[in-house]
């Protein structure tokens, strides 16, 4: 029950904030490569050299037969941060033959997140109103969504069923989002 409530807030807001924090192409890729890319690439290379190869660490661990969690934890955490930085850099400035197509798909993906975030916010408000009007008041003040689904079903046979399926699917996605949402943003 708690995960659904958390998810009804986090699912649409995380989609909207993902759009808000999307990578924005303010300068051209050529300008970016000349000015900033070399610095970021060298920083990533330095960090990866500091970490060393994971296979070398595993071989060393197998040789010594000592596995201490305290010593592995900072290196593994730094490796996760490095992978996240590389992924963000590739997303913001795609490379290769189809870089323009990749950038266009990235923009469309973030626009879809905004649209689904706004729709999700509307569905969350409607679910919350239904819970207040129909479930918390005894006797129910108004059959709200029940009446809406019946009216949609009388308009066209599958319209009410489709709307009910969308609301149920959103409720399941909200519960999953609430369960997967981390309280502390630690990795």
From Swiss-Prot:
Look up the coiled coil feature and give its residue ranges: none
Keywords on record: Cell membrane, Membrane, Transmembrane, Transmembrane helix
Q: Where in the cell is it found?
A: Cell membrane
Q: How does it sit in the membrane?
A: Multi-pass membrane protein
Q: Does the keyword Cell membrane apply?
A: yes
Membrane-spanning ranges: 1-21, 101-119, 126-145, 156-176
Topological domain ranges for the Cytoplasmic compartment: 120-125, 177-187
Where are the Extracellular topological domains?
22-100, 146-155
Query: GO CC: one term?
Result: plasma membrane
The UniProt entry, under Pfam families, shows:
LMBR1
Q: Which family does it belong to?
A: Belongs to the Casparian strip membrane proteins (CASP) family.
Would you tell me the protein name for this molecule? CASP-like protein SELMODRAFT_416718
Q: Which organism is it from?
A: Selaginella moellendorffii (Spikemoss)
